[in-house]
């Protein structure tokens, strides 16, 4: 691996940071992580278990990118984008592929949208191997950049990061956006209250722990239950990086 000696770096609010740090730890590759300063302690500690090279930045995309570039240049690190990277997108596609291999008759898959890597991979898997399955994206109403991007035909940015779904605060990228444009059928929006209500329902009824960024898909399904009644639907809820005690239902 070309960067095994020098190391790698990414910016992430938690999930990709955790995954990359764990992989780098197993492969004995130096790993540096840039995280927003408002990242909760639970996520910080999860990453800290695998790397001590954690740097804080302001909670906006510009700060994440500039901080990452500065550290990468200083330490000669290889940058791996958390969502706008083809290898990452293809890696994400295996989630939907496994789901569709088990349930090949699904008519829809709902996927969260943050930086766009997960839903881009999800849509590639579905449309290449299970063409009859439609992909629905979901994002918080407060950070609806993907929804606006598809409407305008160009990558839009968020004016705020004010959502409990902290993993969905980032913007789309030049690699995943064309994939989303071509293969994602529709993007649905949900409110903060709808996200919290769905999160509570998942924890209480399904007895599984997910983070708010994952709960958006159930929130969208409940909000549009009449439209999707009697349809076979898969929900991708792949993030469980959350401190339950920090949530206010």
Task: Locate the predicted segments by residue.
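PLP-dependent amino-acid enzyme catalytic core
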Residues: 1-249
């Amino acid at each position: 691996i070309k960067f095994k000696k020098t190391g790698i770096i990414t910016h992430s609010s938690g999930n990709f940071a955790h995954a990359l740090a764990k992989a780098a730890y197993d492969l004995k590759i130096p790993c540096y992580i840039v995280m927003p300063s408002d990242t909760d302690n639970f996520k910080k500690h999860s990453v800290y278990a695998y790397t001590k090279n954690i740097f804080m930045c302001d909670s906006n995309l510009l700060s994440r990118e500039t901080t990452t570039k500065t550290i990468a240049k200083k330490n000669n690190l290889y940058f791996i984008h958390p969502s706008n990277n083809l290898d990452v997108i293809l890696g994400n596609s295996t989630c939907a592929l496994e789901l569709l291999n088990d349930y090949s008759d699904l008519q829809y898959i709902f996927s969260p949208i943050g930086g766009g890597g997960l839903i881009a991979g999800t849509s590639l898997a579905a449309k290449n191997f299970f063409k009859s399955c439609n992909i629905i994206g979901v994002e918080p109403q407060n950070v609806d950049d993907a929804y606006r991007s598809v409407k305008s035909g160009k990558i839009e940015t968020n004016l705020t990061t004010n959502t409990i779904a902290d993993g969905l605060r980032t913007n789309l990228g030049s690699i995943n956006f064309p994939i989303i444009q071509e293969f994602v059928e529709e993007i649905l929006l949900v409110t903060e209250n709808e996200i919290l209500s769905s999160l509570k329902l998942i924890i209480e009824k399904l007895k599984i722990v997910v983070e708010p960024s994952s709960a958006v898909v159930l929130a969208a399904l409940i909000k549009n239950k009449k439209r999707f009644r009697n349809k076979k639907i898969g929900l991708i809820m792949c993030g469980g990086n959350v401190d339950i005690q920090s949530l206010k239902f």
